[in-house]
Amino acid sequence: MLHRLLLLIFSCSMACAGDIYQKNQSMGKAESIKPFDHGVEIKTAEGTLIATVFSPTIIKMHFTKKSRESDTLSYAKRHDLQPSKAFKANESSDAYRIETDSLILSISKNPVRIRFSTKSGILINEDEPAFGTSWIGEEVTTYKKLISDEKFIGMGEKTGGLNRRGEGFTHWNTDYFGYPTNADPIYMSTPFYIGLHESQGAKVMYGIFMDNSYKSHFNFGASNDRFSSFTAEDGDMVYYFIYHTTVPGIIESYTSITGRITLPPLWSLGFQQCRYSYYPDKEVLRIAETFREKKIPADVIYLDIHYMDKYKIFTWNQDRFPDPKGMISTLKQKGFNTAVIIDPGIKVEKGYSAYEQGVKQNLFLKYPDATDYTGQVWPGWCHFPDFTNPDTRTWWGNSFKDLVDVGIRGFWNDMNEPATWGQRFPDLVEFSFEGLKGTHRRGHNVYGMQMARATFEGTKDLLKGERPFILTRAGFSGVQRYSAVWTGDNVSSDDHMMLGIRMLSSLGIAGVPYVGMDIGGFSGNPSKELFARWISIGAFAPLSRAHVCVDNKDQEPWSFGERVEDIARNYLNLRYMMLPYIYSSFHEASQSGMPIWRSLAIEYPFDSKIYDGRYQHQFTIGKGLMIAPVNSVQEFTKVYFPGSQPWYDFYSDSKYAPGTEDHVDAPLEKLPAFVQGGSIIPMQSIIQHTGEKSSDTLFVHVYAANSGVTNQQIYHDDGLTYSYEKGAYSHMNIIYDAGKKNITFEAPKGNYKTHHNVIAILLHGFDEVPKGMNINGTSTKVEKRSVSFMKALSNFDPLGGPAREGFMNVQAIHIPYPKAKTSIQW
């Protein structure tokens, strides 16, 4: 009897286990095929595929178990993105085919599998034949056949190497103080990557963006040699497939989906000084005065959480800051803009205005029983605004009025992963999703992005034509439309500095160009050498900001002794000299999505040496200025010079052959930097802040090329308002034709008049510079001139510093700032 009872129990347990077991289900045989104006809908017993053409280079693949009209809300894509009818379609017995001007999508019928190829039939990307797109319960995965030589780049704010092959990553925004250099996930999610491989002798590249905000997982051949894959733990499988013949083309297509930056205020491109925290007001003013006394250029000072009354947002601590408006006005007179931190948590406190309004207007995230969710952060127990509710976004934006009225122009969104003590935000918490409803599982990754959106839209409206500056820690694909991003609470170490370099490069590939890291490291205390090296590198970052944790040693540029102060001053002076080049690069980013800080993989994706651990940290600012970072203890390094044009040492004009590797000196005061032949780099005179006018001369540095045609845009506007949208800008194209020995300044477009009246053209590396040149057919004299980008360090130490400034001898001509096309011939 006992034996029978045990057998019955065992049989029941096995039956239950069988019910629990969820087998992988992939898309099976096509049961119906329905073409529509923009693509095709294919149904199987397992699910439905809707393929939609958006452009010759972009096709959206949507796999769902629901109807075609099911919820397709996306915060990542532009709201005005429209599908296309420009394609041909045909059906055979075994496949359905869509052909655009750039690529071919073939969908096999039994089973439904995806293959992308070029117009000439070369394979771009295809499903793993056995799995395709599959479900295990609610989890959905697309498996792609792994090609032997395939490399993967992108993924945004991720640790690891430049080439993601052999690695796996999770997208789930995570507050990770002092994250290790191999941590994953951290603060931000951008589920986009670029694949690179050779097929039939052709170099092929493509991009895949998975538009699903649930927790997701990407596998680039980690623990297997059969497939790459991307997985969402719930929701539909929606991905955009992008094909182009260049990485810049893929980035441009990707950002046509997710959007591009609007031009930030020019002052936000100056140096930014932050710490946790500057207070009281006298200390803030002392920091500002010290920058000016020491002639170290800077534009922004931050106030961290100690400016608030008991950490409550939209309040001031009256003891520490009795007159915020007066302090901010004084800072403004000294050329500083002020940025303040704003976290999402709103303290549960009777009489606190933000709390009372949020409860009364029903604006907070909720439990399923309709009570407001409460979690602990800096102020104590808090409610959290539901930024997927349009009413909340409007209220939030209006809540900045008092800050705007006292003169705040920078708004720093932190703790918006969202972060709470305990790191266990309950999954059952409900989000509005524009009235469609959903849980924290879907809303978590877009929370920070929608907070940044609400902050940007609200402050933009309040500033009435003036540009706000927004900085966020957390985000999702598309966050670049609203905010700059920094890489969170990093550590004062060489490894973290080098990791930050890789992450900025990867963020740029993922369509997020306005990025930076905490110079010097947020946690820990950097050595003198580490801070010197870090600020040299950080001076080239799109967002150049120093920051440090509470109770840590000071990390202002003068905090490490005279030598480091001189190094910091030199590199920040250089940043301000380069603002015409940097701002023009920001304009390019706003038009094409191209990053300012660029991995070498953008221009040289199939050069295997750039993925070498020795060279993967090299990057360019714009297209032509290459930085070869080194750590704080290296005094020389090996540099790789890619491409087909010569490279010139930025400080001496020493010439390096393309395709070579060479050892170069890297003393602490000289970060290795090189300019590619054909590059055109506009600069201005040194200023202490962007509110100062530089001299009336714009210095245009041209570097000799072996052959070919290159160009450089120079873009100006008022740097403060949105008047450029109505034509108040100056946009000039400079073309250098090495073969024809010609430099052409095209007539500027736009109706903004720059204060520059003269252009000094400085020729670097021209072996046969004529004694005279023709400007629009009229002969002009060429002058010899010495130029230097760095001043000698004070109190020269013959064992540790340069004996003098590094001067270069160049040829120079001067022309009036062009109003019409101007051609220079030699």
Features from the language model and the residues they span:
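Bacterial Sec-dependent N-terminal signal peptides
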Residues: 1-23
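Generic structural signal for short, solvent-exposed loop/turn connectors between secondary structure elements
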Residues: 1-7, 40, 45-48, 407, ...
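Hydrophobic alpha-helical segments and their boundary regions
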Residues: 6-7, 91, 359, 507, ...
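N-terminal accessory segment at the very beginning of proteins
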Residues: 16-258, 264-267, 274-276, 281-283, ...
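Catalytic-domain carbohydrate-binding cleft regions of carbohydrate-active enzymes
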Residues: 18-24, 122-670, 675-676
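Flexible coil/linker segments and helix-coil junctions enriched in charged and small residues
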Residues: 794-799, 805
